[in-house]
Amino acid sequence: MHAFYSLALRLSPVLAVTIDEINGNRFLSPYQDQDVSNIKGLVTAKSTSGFYLRSTSPDTDNRSSESIYIYDSEAISQISVGDVITLSGTVSEYRYSSSNVYMTEITSPSKIEVSSSDNEVVPVVIGEDGLMPPTEQFSSLDDGDVYGLPKNASQISNENPLLQPSKYGMDFWESLSGELATLTGLRAITKPNQYGDTWVVGAWPSTGSNERGGLTMRSNGWSFSFFLGYVTLQLI
């Protein structure tokens, strides 16, 4: 009996949940380190190390992203953009540096089954005629002052606050984690760095604009309406 009880504690339950349930309405997934099954979604993009999956049955909660990254370089050969698939895997939180916010993803995907192909993939529009990011406040932890708490983005993951995407910049982008998006009216505000990454701002209201065409970071009214674009995706 004791041996059976010990084994049961080590076994991770396999849960049938949706993508939005996996992402949840906070920065970290409520299913972290748990095995999940029968995850259904539309393949929206592929990278060299995995692919992105969007729920085919979205909910009405704008705090929970409908998309998620599937991390596995071998799995990409089994699917194409536009496929509707189901799979199982393990929910993980990943960041490549302790100063970064975690990204929710599914690792070790298995039981990948394609139910249909050549489905239309429509990106979410951010900017004119689409979603607009908030422009005044960074997060619910800094009390309106980007130079105050949390002082670095990693503490967001420690507190794991409830997302408020219409109010806070970090929450807005987190609510779109893993999503394929079209951003309108992009304007570069820096030169490319050594990796070719460029900070840009889109066709949405922003604060801190300066005479050089860039954005100035300042406390109490700092804009969180720009971002760094660097991921290369396969969309066909």
Where are these regions (language model features)?
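Extended non-catalytic accessory segments flanking core domains
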Residues: 15-236
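Fungal secretory targeting signals
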Residues: 1-16
